[in-house]
Amino acid sequence: MGGAMLAGWLAAEVPASFTVVDPVATEVPAAVRLLREVPAERFDVVLLGVKPQALNDAASALAPVMTEQALLLSLLAGAELASLAARFPVNGGIVRVMPNLAAAVGKSPIGLYAADLSEAARAAVTELLAPLGSLEWLAGEDQLDAVTALVGSGPAFVYRFIEALAAGGAALGLDPAQAQRLALSMVEGAASLAATANQPPADLARRVTSPGGTTAAGLVVLDQEAALARLVADTLRAARDRGAELAAAVRG
């Protein structure tokens, strides 16, 4: 996720210098400094993108090099503000951030939550993240597990749906590669229309549907016993619950 955000910042030509600390990365863009270990320098903004299980080690290495007014942006699913504050004694603020891979192209929805963040820090975070997509500040930290499921994990679910559409098209006789191109282009176009139309998706679906037509026949299958709605709800719930499990593990 951090790599996608970095790509988005570089594409937007954000006026900042970037240092990536990664013991296994082999290459980064030319404008980025890659280090194997945390340097003996001071940083004003730290983006934390490790696995939750590595939080303690990351904190031991990073906390000493953060300036007194540094901002910590955490991508860690399940790592709550209290857990982060106990490991990173910073005054600038701690913000939990949940984007997705579309940050690389400036199209990610981004859920954010912080407590006791100054107006100046909030403005700085907004300015930094705005090039990556659309920002949604959340009213409560308890909403982040749901945002992680919907926004962070959501692209994988959409990709699976595109894969299923392509496979279904191939099963109807289309060339598999052609079916995949058609499915991808269809989803891209439908999403673009939904994003620009001043109508809810349900209304757009009705616009496509003629009584007794082909679309109506397909929707009968999708809507039978609310099959699609139940499947999606169960999928998001499973991802949400896993986030809660990760939070419990971080709390110890």
Q: Predicted segments — roles?
A:
Residues 17-19:
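Short beta-strand element of Class I
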Residues 5-7, 21, 26-28, 35-112:
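Rossmann-like NAD(P)(H) cofactor-binding subdomain of soluble oxidoreductases
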Residues 95, 143-149, 201-206:
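Short pre-catalytic strand/loop immediately N-terminal to key active-site residues, enriched for Gly-Thr
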Residues 83-93, 109-146, 158-196, 242:
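Internal alpha-helical scaffold of NAD(P)-dependent oxidoreductase catalytic cores
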Residues 1-2:
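Hydrophobic/small residue at the entry helix of a nucleotide-binding pocket
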Residues 184-252:
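NAD(P)-dependent Rossmann-like dehydrogenase/reductase catalytic/cofactor-binding core
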Residues 8-15:
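A short, Lys/Arg-enriched amphipathic alpha-helix followed by its capping loop at the start of a domain
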